[in-house]
Amino acid sequence: MDTTLPPPQHMEREPLKSKSSLLPMTRRGNGSKGQKILLLTNHFRVNFRKPNSHNFFHYSVTITYEDGSPLLAKGFGRKILEKVQQTCQADLGCKHFAYDGDKNLYTVGPLPRSSLDFSVVLETAPSRRNADKRLKLPHQSKKFNVAILFAPPEIPMEAIANALQGKKTKHLLDAIRVMDCILSQNAARQGCLLVRQSFFHNDAKYFANIGEGVDCCKGFHSSFRTTQGGLSLNIDVSTAMIVKPGPVVDFLIANQGVNDPFSINWKKAKNTLKNLRVKVLPSNQEYKITGLSGLHCKDQTFTWKKRNQNREFEEVEITVSDYFTRIREIELRYSGGLPCINVGKPNRPTYFPIELCELVSLQRYTKALTKFQRSNLIKESRQNPQQRIGVLTRALKTSNYNDDPMLQECGVRIGSDFTQVEGRVLPTPKLKAGKEQDIYPINGSWNFKNKPATVTRWAVVNFSARCDPQKIIDDLTRCGKMKGINVDSPYHVVFEENPQFKDATGSVRVDKMFQHLQSILGEVPPKFLLCILEKKNSDVYEKSCSMWNCECIVPPQNLNDQYLTNLLLKINAKLGGLNSVLDMELSGTMPLVMRVPTIIIGMDVSHGSPGQSDHIPSIAAVVSSREWPLISKYRACVRTQSPKVEMIDSLFKPVSDKDDQGIMRELLLDFHSSSGKKPNHIIIFRDGVSESQFNQVLNIELDQMMQINHHTKFFQTESPNNVLPGTIIDSNICHQHNNDFYLCAHAGKIGTTRPTHYHVLYDEIGFDTDQLQELVHSLSYVYQRSTTAISLVAPICYAHLAAAQMATAMKFEDMSETSSSHGGITTAGAVPVPPMPKLNTNVASSMFFC
């Protein structure tokens, strides 16, 4: 057999000039398979009275202090422009405007002049000399200069009308951006927190405590969409995590789960509090936290300028505690033994006792949520379809968009009814267990029972002294017998860790365990290891994953059958088995995939947790099918890349004229070696990119992609339940030109089903619409960790898992803590991008990510 695989001719990279002409493909027609069904969707019809008679005018905005220095504080631009609107109506020609909070302002029609300058005074404005004064007086005033300058070209509103009529227009995205800016301005006037196109009211009735000092704030997303059915307003429920407002000390106690302020981990607290805003009692003046003092309040000194008997200033060293208790006559109950809050600059700190500081409302919490918080968030976010319909109806009414002055100037009126669309429920794909037993899923799920599978040549290694490994083995064997799975006895029963190494590093502990295994088993290693760990995120995990094909578990106290069944599913997949396959894989009923060598690829880039993505490398994970004609078995290739880079930069990595060390070559070689053939067809699913990146991805990665991060929902017209699994929509609210569709492959048992939005960017294989939709639907049934259909295709889920597992193994989350600190301000240094550790050959070719 030919073991080499030169890059196919058609995969050679073309010059940028020829690739830059690629655009997303147009729709080839709608699908017809499946039972038709009428649905409602959370899109509301938008009517234009005179779309051809107006242009949007774009102006750049510059805000400076009175001395010409720029305004740097975020969030105050809107207040300043609101003041301009209130006090300078005549100069503005009585025109309304939409301001994006930064440097862009839009009007319907022109302002009286192309260049306008204003001076306004704002009460309680942010001081640019935040650290120049020790104390702020309440109700301080600041004068600002505002320059508004016309920034051509004009944006014709008819671009939207032209797009809806099927005409090409280069101003469509600009016009929609202005319309969305008007929606944001509407929310800003109500004092909402704005997060892209979502807004959140400062009202306690929208807050729900999810534990550890964090609230879930319920808000709404609103945006305009051009669809086959016309322009629509998409409204949906959104959720943001916010810091629980109130005393800083109370927040830290809750966040760290301690009983009193003297048990707080202040190193961790410093990272948590950075950049949060506080109001300081009794003045209620707001500041941004830059750090903590290095000493306790009773020991931290600063230089205070006081008047002597001659009315002259003299400098005196005084502690923060003494200053507030003796000079300001403010009683401090417990701050003396705690650090101070620093709101100053590195070279000139400004300290306040912590008990005088309260966190203000509507501040986003950007740290990773704990398991406890995630569990509570799911409970608080649940809304069945009828509840969501009611909430969205009230949200549209409360927003009162039809009375918005700018929307009125645009001639826009928004309907109050959910849009009715036609969908189809696709036939459920038939599955096979082994080669004989047929499985017919019901409502997107099936039983895992009497499925021919065997767990053999495995071993148990125990790194924990807190559990009974023999009980785990017995329960796993018992559960396997109930499900028809033969679980052989493991090697040597259990390999226990030598207690003398329990305090060693994870690398040493795993090496010693490996030597222990070799001394007993010789050169014939087990195919699979069940590693019992003492805790999650153990440093044993990293080395175990790179050396062994293993499943690392922290056993719960109650080993129920559901836990054991899920464990068996994962073990069987890691051992190279398949819990079920599509009938079409064995029968070849999809000729374009099953009768022509076809590789299916899933791509995703995983970034750090919110608030940490700037400091830790991103992980690109690509999975590919193997052993064609199977499309249920995959392997993964995972690489690191620079933080927040969405495009995968190592798909191709030529090191010479004849050698390439990129991801694609590695996966194509694996397909060739496992299938005995080179692929004629390549089908690629790409997750994690927005519509604005389609052209970039198309010309760099050339793929088919999906989007989970959208806000369209569907509701049955004659039932309060979720839509049926297999429901597909490819008309009305879909793109007016491009080839896209929505698919609800899974059965939504909790809350409201969220469909996956698929965009087909490029197709030279020649799928007809029904064939492609059937393939995508079927790929939601091949996820080996589950006995239910999942919401998106399995290759993408596997890419997510592979990236997450390797990120955990490399402990990237810990890298965000390694930053330099100076004067209370933490700054991240250059982010290193360490290479991914090389996996053992047997591990790399397995479904280790399951």
Swiss-Prot record:
Residues 1-30 are annotated as: Disordered. It holds the Pfam family ArgoL1. GO terms for molecular function: RNA binding. SMART domains: DUF1785 (SM01163), Piwi (SM00950). One of its GO terms (biological process) is regulation of translation. Involved in RNA-mediated post-transcriptional gene silencing (PTGS). Main component of the RNA-induced silencing complex (RISC) that binds to a short guide RNA such as a microRNA (miRNA) or small interfering RNA (siRNA). RISC uses the mature miRNA or siRNA as a guide for slicer-directed cleavage of homologous mRNAs to repress gene expression. Belongs to the argonaute family. Ago subfamily. This is Protein argonaute 8. It comes from Arabidopsis thaliana (Mouse-ear cress).
